[in-house]
Amino acid sequence: MVFDTIAAISTFPGEAGIGIVRLSGDDALEIISKIFKPYKSKDIKKVKSHTLHYGHIVDPETEEVYDEVLVSIMEKPNTYTREDIVEINCHGGIVVTSKILELVLKQGARLAEPGEFTKRAFLNGRIDLSQAEAVIDIIRAKTMLANRYAQKQLVGYVGSKIKEMKDKIMGLLVHLLALIDFPEEDVEELERKEILETAKEIVEDIDKLIASSESGRIIREGLKTAIIGKPNVGKSSLLNALLKENRAIVTDIPGTTRDIIEEYVNVKGIPIKLIDTAGIRDTDELVEKIGVTKSKEVLAEADLILFVLDASRELTKEDYEIFDILTGKNIIFVLNKIDLPKKIDEKELKDLTKDGIIIEVSTVEKIGLEELENTIYNLVFRGDISLREDEIVINSRHKEALINAKKYMESCVEAIEGGYSEDLITIDLNAALDQLGKITGETATEDLINEIFERFCVGK
């Protein structure tokens, strides 16, 4: 596939030790030869591939030296895009990188669109679409666990699973076409039984991948963890303690937190999206009332609730009312302020929590915080909240395609069991193949491909 030559700054556009201007395309070597003066004069177009060269970037018109650089030369096909790639490693900073990019564009390159380097890797067949999406996940990973899953996808774990299912479906199509061309009653009955078994296996395989979509959301977006409780029990103090910084305002005045505060914290590799909410209580104060409404909305979407109770006060009607709206949720009861004289009634507490998990903490003395983090981690990995360290995770786009593929495969199973003709069965199988192809890109539309790569930053 032939494209023009593109260029972009691939590093952060600000003050930094090093900046990189990347080129990709058939004219990359020609362009760099016009603006790069290597040490010990040599023809940069004839050097060995995958080598690094010291020299200066010089404006060919004015002879002005722009910067002292190292230039990487990588010839196709063994490159990121499977095209000739040149990377100019210059000093960081907006001025130098921008001037070098400007010079490169003046020599005939085009400014790359967001994600265009990775898009070319896909269009040139080096990676499939699921691997391209893994690049975004690696860039956006909030923890090493998220990075680990993204790396598995990048090397083709998702694509290989999809290929296995597609190969099985292709095998079924071959069998069915043989039955259409060479119908023999005894053989046909045996073949249809085998086809039915394989079709059911494929449905099970699809189900396993669909089940991992919730895990994928947690890994990519973080475990949505709402800190809930009545006013002044120490919700904001708990947020600050877990973040190990003062992010939320803490006072003795009930109702201080009026809005939702969201922050990420890394708990043993799991990205936790902590959501500090306004204290839930009946109030006539308009702003606080809006905050309480928002808190209740957060509850509906939360994966985990940290229900904060005050150990230095007796349980109140407000505590019970809050518990009533938490039905069906994963809850950890956080008994805060244990550094103060305990006034909470143990029997009432047991009645309220119904043998739930209770962690005693003091956000002031930093007591119990590690136990709380361990409890969250164990909840996730023992299966109370869906996530397994050894599984392959998928995103919402993959899930939609898999659900559609499953629908067609179930229709295929029904058709075989109902004795329908081979021609009708092949329609469902081909439709399932089409859906699976959307995941890896073979049958993805141009609009879908463009939409995916528009999520990338320029230079990647």
From Swiss-Prot:
It comes from the Bacteria. (6S)-5-formyl-5,6,7,8-tetrahydrofolate binds at residues 22, 87, 126, 460. GTP binds at residues 232-237, 251-257, 276-279. SUPFAM superfamilies: P-loop containing nucleoside triphosphate hydrolases. K(+) binds at residues 232, 251, 253, 256. CDD domains: trmE (cd04164), TrmE_N (cd14858). Gene3D superfamilies: P-loop containing nucleotide triphosphate hydrolases (3.40.50.300), Probable tRNA modification gtpase trme, domain 1 (3.30.1360.120), tRNA modification GTPase MnmE domain 2 (1.20.120.430). Binds 1 potassium ion per subunit. Its cofactor is K(+). PANTHER family: TRNA MODIFICATION GTPASE GTPBP3 (PTHR42714), TRNA MODIFICATION GTPASE GTPBP3, MITOCHONDRIAL (PTHR42714:SF2). Mg(2+) binds at residues 236, 257. Exhibits a very high intrinsic GTPase hydrolysis rate. Involved in the addition of a carboxymethylaminomethyl (cmnm) group at the wobble position (U34) of certain tRNAs, forming tRNA-cmnm(5)s(2)U34. InterPro entries: G_TrmE, GTP-bd, GTP-bd_TrmE_N, GTPase_MnmE, MnmE_dom2, MnmE_helical, P-loop_NTPase, Small_GTP-bd. Its EC number is 3.6.-.-. One of its GO terms (molecular function) is GTP binding. Pfam families: MMR_HSR1, MnmE_helical, TrmE_N. NCBIfam families: mnmE_trmE_thdF (TIGR00450), PRK05291.1-3 (NF003661), small_GTP (TIGR00231). GO terms for biological process: tRNA methylation; tRNA wobble uridine modification. This is tRNA modification GTPase MnmE. Keywords: Cytoplasm, GTP-binding, Hydrolase, Magnesium, Metal-binding, Nucleotide-binding, Potassium, tRNA processing. It is found in: Cytoplasm.
